[in-house]
Amino acid sequence: MDLLYLSSFRSRHYHQHSLAAYDTAEYWTCPIEMLHLQTEKRGTADIFRQYECRYIKTNFPFCYCTFNKYRTCGIFCITNFSAVRIINPFV
């Protein structure tokens, strides 16, 4: 998998395929059950914080779940050269 492959897939996805062709909820984002939850004690309140996204199999090799800048779990891919973000239009 390389940058050209990812780029061409993304173009095909947006320009030749309907989003309805995909299970978009799981294809683009990581299911909640893939997250570790930890409890933090703050006074009398228990604060639940998502701190790790577990691996989920995607349609790309070398892809894994991690937090994006919005603190939601998204799909990222690692190539031999760099980390490539798969755009998530549903965030």
UniProtKB/Swiss-Prot annotation:
Gene that specifies this protein: xpaR7
Species whose genome carries this gene: Bacillus licheniformis
Protein name: Protein xpaR7
Domain of life: Bacteria
